[in-house]
Amino acid sequence: MKNRNTIFTFFISFILCLGINISHAQTPFDAIMMNQRESCLAVIYEHSWFDEYWEGTYLRTNGTIETVKRDMVMPMIAIGVFDQLNLLVAAPYVKTESTEPNGGYFAGAKGFQDLSLALKGQIINKQLNSGTLSLLATVGFSTPMTNYLSDYRPYSIGFGANEFSFRGIAQYKMEKGFYVRGALAYLHRGQTEAERDYYYNNGSYYTAWMDVPSAWNYNAVAGVWLLNNSLKLEANYLGIKSTSGDDIRPYNAAQPTNKVSFDQVGISAQYYLNKPQGIGALSYFSHTINGRNTGKASMFGVGLTYQFKI
């Protein structure tokens, strides 16, 4: 087996899934807040694939399993607890598989991944020169919903450990609809249990428990609202950098202890219908341009959103 970037399964999807707030989208990474008692349900479909991966920093071609593919369906809801405090909940279902050249075959995996909860609060929202400056903070927690095997790389549907996230967000939006946004997050991860009692991580460990490396998450966006705030277009960058971990050893499978880093660039579009009111649609595409111990993956996604009052 070759490495599969399961670590970003939640990140990429949660970045781009959204709710609607008076024709505006909301994610854990943006600067938009829903009003109190407003809710929005979103359903996202995402497909990703790769046939190359980084073994450490060396780029290899998948030989035995060729192209690794992942499909995900994720329901999500965003709730306006207060005007300045929102709750977001997501529960993705993931299926992985690969093509099988040379007569080889490896079974994929499927199931619900992690239950993810996030609270987003608005700290500052004020006029500054000809635009608006917004500062926000997000705290999140995710935990496995099922007893999936995290050490089955590249097919594992997740890294199998609890995660706490702490994120700061800053956005400056101009009057004509252009905006720039940046976000920085620290992702603190726990341990996952493997179905073996020995592994190597820069040394021998005689235990089934593996430390999943914590990581820093970077996000930068440039976007614009068009058509009377009914169409939003964005170009974005996403980066992940683990704070510890080991490299994949030559011709060995990846494991949850690996030090994963990657840089992705992408585009997205979101459109909100005037009638029926509260309905929106989204699409996005992203590509991994650099990485370490991860697949050189591309992905696209589509989704629908519906806003309603509680």
What are these regions (language model features)?
Residues 45-51, 91-97, 123, 141-147, ...:
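Transmembrane beta-strands of outer-membrane beta-barrel pores
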Residues 29-37, 84, 125-134, 176-177, ...:
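Short loop/turn motifs that connect adjacent beta-strands in outer-membrane beta-barrel proteins
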Residues 43-45, 75-79, 89, 117-121, ...:
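Residues on the lipid-exposed face of transmembrane beta-strands in outer-membrane beta-barrel proteins
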Residues 99-207, 254-258:
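Outer-membrane pore/translocation modules
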Residues 37-39, 45-49, 157-249:
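Detector for outer-membrane/organellar transmembrane beta-barrel domains
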Residues 69-73, 110-117, 133, 160-164, ...:
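Residues that define the transmembrane beta-barrel architecture of outer-membrane proteins
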Residues 47-72, 154-156:
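Surface-exposed strand-loop-strand hairpins of Gram-negative outer-membrane beta-barrel proteins
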Residues 54-56, 63, 205-310:
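Outer membrane beta-barrel transmembrane domains
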